[in-house]
């Protein structure tokens, strides 16, 4: 098997595109009316961030592709998960939590931990079809601090999905119906309290459809607007709600 030169490694190329940032405390602002309960469910799934880190650790202890940079990329992503957990906990500290949602999220966490799929494949599916709907939901229905955090995490997750999907593909690991069933149950729980709405960002069917498309095809054309979603202007945010860029 031909080994790629390190300079051409897709793994190293993907981590080179990351933008360093640091988690900082945020202030409590106003949430979009009608989306609050779902946002707290989405926030409760922050408890999956560190388990994703553990999935990557389990993957590092198994056979990996020989492509240069794969180990460095997985370790880099582990550090990101720690920062994501810290940033999301700052949101929880500012807004409080829904204790019922927090408890139910533990059952979801248990199901993902116990699923027998390859750990890096599980990380890929979680990030691609769950985190990639949670994050835009938070950007369109959260306050300044939530939008800032979700935008920064989203940039990391783009690299994560690319890296973890490539690892799974090189290992010949594919998601079956069992993993899809768990993905669907997780998405149903997140968006269960939404109904049908003319505002697609508060429409249950819209979000469930995006999760399904991301699982099946790896893309969701209807989420293209998130690339242009309202980003936080510096004049609209107190300093405590802005990320700290630079060496993390």
Over which residues does each language-model region extend?
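Non-heme di-metal
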Residues: 1-248
């Amino acid at each position: 098997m031909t080994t790629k030169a390190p300079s051409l490694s897709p793994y190293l190329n993907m981590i080179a595109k990351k933008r360093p940032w640091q988690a900082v405390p945020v202030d409590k602002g106003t949430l979009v009316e009608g989306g609050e309960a779902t946002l707290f469910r989405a926030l409760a799934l922050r408890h999956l961030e560190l388990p994703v880190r553990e999935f990557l650790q389990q993957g590092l202890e198994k056979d990996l592709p020989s492509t240069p940079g794969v180990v460095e990329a997985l370790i880099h992503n582990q550090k990101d998960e720690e920062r994501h957990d810290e940033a999301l906990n700052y949101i929880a500290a500012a807004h409080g939590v829904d204790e019922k949602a927090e408890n139910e999220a533990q059952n979801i966490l248990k199901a993902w931990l116990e699923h027998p799929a390859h750990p890096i494949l599980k990380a890929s599916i979680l990030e691609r079809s769950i985190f990639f709907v949670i994050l835009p939901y938070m950007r369109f229905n959260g306050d300044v601090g939530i939008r800032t955090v979700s935008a920064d995490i989203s940039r990391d997750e783009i690299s994560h999905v690319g890296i973890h999907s490539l690892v799974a593909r090189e290992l010949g690991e594919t998601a079956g119906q069992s993993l899809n069933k768990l993905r669907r149950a997780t998405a149903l729980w997140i968006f269960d309290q939404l109904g049908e709405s003319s505002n697609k960002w508060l429409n249950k069917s819209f979000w469930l459809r995006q999760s399904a498309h991301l699982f099946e095809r790896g893309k969701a054309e209807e989420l293209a607007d998130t690339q242009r979603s309202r980003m936080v202007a510096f004049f609209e945010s107190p300093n405590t709600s802005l990320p700290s860029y630079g060496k993390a």
